[in-house]
């Protein structure tokens, strides 16, 4: 299977680092081989229109049907019509990021409780497997 995520107008991207790290944006225009113009839309994702390096973004599978250099109002309407935010939140990538964020916010006692729960789960699975083998 070939590579299918290309930098194109309407491609939804995840910003990796910088002030907008972790936010989604949409490619509005391609500036050159190293940069593109992106916008949130600001009302939905909080990303203002800006030129950003390809090194700072990760391409997602999502695209929004827009024209080159689309206005903010047009972009916002296209996002809502395509239900882009819901599609993103339903993706495995977004779920992994949310889980990572939740894990990072755990206290020491919370991590201990997770460890105990994993041990209990493992013990139950081992018992069931033993019963099935007999």
Residue ranges and their predicted role:
Residues 2-9, 16, 28-134:
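Ferredoxin-like alpha/beta domains used as RNA- or RNAP-binding modules
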